[in-house]
A protein has these predicted regions:
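AAA+ P-loop NTPase nucleotide-binding core of proteostasis motors
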Residues: 1-192
C-alpha cells in the first residue's frame, strides 16, 4: 500500500490532484497518467489484491515521449524512492543472475541480488525497468515471480517484498514502425 505519510490530510489532497500534477510535468501522456492514478487510488482505497505489487505497467513508444520522466515524477509526487535498472546491462544470461545473486561457486556469490537489495532498502518505490526488450529472456521468469507473488528471494535467502512497489517497464520495441506525426510523416511519404 501507499505510505502513511501520503495518506495524511496533505497526502489526500495530493492524491486527488495526482493526475493533474503529473499532466503539468508530462505532456501528451494523459491515458497513461489516468491509468497510473486509477490503480494507485484503488490501492490506497484497499481495492487491490494484497499479494500483488501496487501496479505493473508497460510504457511502449519512441524515445523522448516521457516514459522515464513520468516514472520519476510519479515517485517524486508520491514521496517514494525511484529505482531504475537499465535493462541493456542484462543482455547476457549470466548478467540476469546479478539481480537475484550469483549461484554458489560463482564470482559474486557472497553478494546479494541487486534487485532484491534495492527493494529491501526502499520497500515503497517506483521500480523502472528501462528498455525491457533489451534484457535476456530469463528476466521474464523473475518478473513472473514478482508479479505473481510480490516477492523475490536472492541467493543468500534475503526476501524482498514487492507489495508496495509500482513496477514500470519501458520499451522502444516497434516504435520505428509506428505512425509518425508532423514533419517526419511528410518526409517519410516523400521518400516512399
Amino acid at each position: 500500500h501507499i505510505p502513511k505519510s501520503t495518506i495524511s490530510s496533505d497526502g489526500s489532497k495530493m492524491m486527488k490532484s495526482l493526475a493533474n500534477n503529473l499532466k503539468k510535468k508530462i505532456f501528451s501522456q494523459d491515458s497513461a497518467i489516468m491509468e497510473l492514478t486509477r490503480v494507485i487510488k484503488a490501492n490506497k482505497a484497499g481495492l487491490s489484491e494484497s499479494n500483488k505489487p501496487i501496479g505493473s505497467f508497460v510504457f511502449a513508444g519512441p524515445s523522448g515521449v516521457g516514459k522515464t520522466e513520468l516514472s520519476k515524477e510519479l515517485a517524486k509526487l508520491l514521496g517514494i524512492a525511484f529505482i531504475k535498472f537499465d535493462m541493456s546491462e542484462y543482455m547476457e544470461p549470466h548478467s540476469i543472475s546479478r539481480l537475484i545473486g550469483a549461484p554458489a561457486g560463482y564470482v559474486g556469490f557472497e553478494q546479494g541480488g541487486l534487485l532484491v537489495d534495492a527493494v529491501r532498502k526502499s520497500p515503497y518505490c517506483v521500480l523502472l525497468l528501462d528498455e525491457i526488450e533489451k534484457a535476456h529472456s530469463d528476466i521474464y521468469n523473475i518478473l513472473l515471480q514478482i508479479l505473481d507473488s510480490a516477492s523475490l528471494t536472492d541467493n543468500l535467502g534475503n526476501r524482498a517484498d514487492f507489495k508496495n512497489v509500482i513496477i514500470i517497464m519501458t520499451s522502444n520495441a516497434g516504435s520505428k514502425d509506428s505512425n509518425t506525426l508532423g514533419f517526419n510523416a511528410a518526409l517519410q511519404h516523400k521518400n516512399d
